[in-house]
């Protein structure tokens, strides 16, 4: 299987450059298994599309203002994108500079203080920050929000709120779990009234999410690592949902990545079952992989040839995904992080007559 198998042409004007005024006003393309028809809805319609007893699982990671700028001793400019916080004064980072900085060199930070280059960590660098407060708190004032590269503007004050889910609480991501951006407090309240239950995982979206696949043969691709936590309480919620015949719906590919990373086969469960797990994942989901943990997912529209296009193709079938994307382009849906979403059902799932 090749990267080019997941290419599609997208008019640039369909790449959303800013969020809508209302989160839940985003369009929602409902994609049931073929041959059922696609349906154009809104995110605010989700209570009508789900059933009492269903379980929505969100990623509760919180985006940090992870972009910094500075200057080397030589005078060369440096851009720093924090990949992961490592305690109060250290971080794993990407560095953009005309020449790679050497271990032991210092970077004077535009926001004040300096950072020492401790060395390389694979494609990343390890930095020690000489700053007055712990890095997590210092970044709130000194850092800039790392909007994705396809958003061709500088981040504004409103992005501090809108590039963050309303349920974000665990600090550590450098990119938002964007499917969650469509949920506001009013929509969450209506879903609760409908009898839909909520669960949470944590996956800290890393800077690797912005990196393109650089090889055409996908068996040569090295997936980036991300830290996640699937807790025992969530595992029990999923077990209860399954026992009562409810459906498990992931809000975003990061939730699917988390749940599939925590899926384990045992003698008692040869087909596998969800188990608590905290740690790094490097899972690469593409067609041929069977996603067992969820029945449906809410997900945004993804970049051509991206690993997320491959994941949703594994879930719903490549032909069905391309049918949905061609429909979305023809209907002028908004794409990527600040864009619209899909409610995507597994191709293994048959919708009952009570579903819309």
Curated annotation (Swiss-Prot):
What InterPro entries does this protein's entry cite? QueA, QueA_dom1, QueA_dom2, QueA_sf
Name the catalysed reactions.
Answer: 7-aminomethyl-7-carbaguanosine(34) in tRNA + S-adenosyl-L-methionine = epoxyqueuosine(34) in tRNA + adenine + L-methionine + 2 H(+)
Subcellular localization: Cytoplasm
| One Gene Ontology cellular component | cytoplasm
Provide the E.C. number(s) assigned to this enzyme. Answer: 2.4.99.17
Q: Which Pfam families match?
A: Queuosine_synth (PF02547)
Q: GO: which molecular function terms? A: S-adenosylmethionine:tRNA ribosyltransferase-isomerase activity
Q: List the disulfide bonds.
A: none
What are its GO biological-process terms? queuosine biosynthetic process; tRNA wobble guanine modification
Which keywords does this Swiss-Prot/TrEMBL entry list? Cytoplasm, Queuosine biosynthesis, S-adenosyl-L-methionine, Transferase
Q: What does this protein do?
A: Transfers and isomerizes the ribose moiety from AdoMet to the 7-aminomethyl group of 7-deazaguanine (preQ1-tRNA) to give epoxyqueuosine (oQ-tRNA).
What family does the Swiss-Prot or TrEMBL record give for this protein? Answer: Belongs to the QueA family.
Q: How does it assemble?
A: Monomer.
Question: What is the official name of this protein in its record?
Answer: S-adenosylmethionine:tRNA ribosyltransferase-isomerase
Give the gene symbol: queA
